[in-house]
Amino acid sequence: MTVFTPVYCCTDKVPVCYSRVDGADYITFSWNSSFWIFNWVSNMVYPRYDLIIGDVRATQNELETTFNEAQEGIESAAAKLLEKDPAKAKAFLTNYTNMTAQSAFDTWKRLGEFIIVKYNDGVVRKMKDGKFERNAIGQPAGVVRPGYPKEFLEEYVKQTGDRYKMPD
């Protein structure tokens, strides 16, 4: 689960969120690293893919559509700059690459925050008009308990046998 962002081959500055910011690597986590933010979101989605993937796809589509719609204008502006001053064209595309990378990072981080609130503890928090519902006294509204798919439950019983069977 990722977002395709424009990166130009002339770019001479790696977006901070794509770098080893805060020493981030495969065993050093950083909240400022795209690698770790995208993996954080993915790892929240995997166990309840059927419930959560719609939120991920909506965010992914929104970002990619925005980037795709801007592409023609960005490349036209870059081509005009290239004719006059190649260094300015390179700086323009470098800045655009960095901006889109940071935008995707920021959006994905907010998506992760949204997912953890909406799906925390195996429930689904109710929403209305894009906001989490509150009851008459301002507290979070009730939740939906979707349970698990029938196939999962059958496989669970198959693997555990009578281990969790309630005594008669």
Predicted regions and their residues:
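C-terminus-biased signal that marks the final domain/tail of proteins
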Residues: 1-168
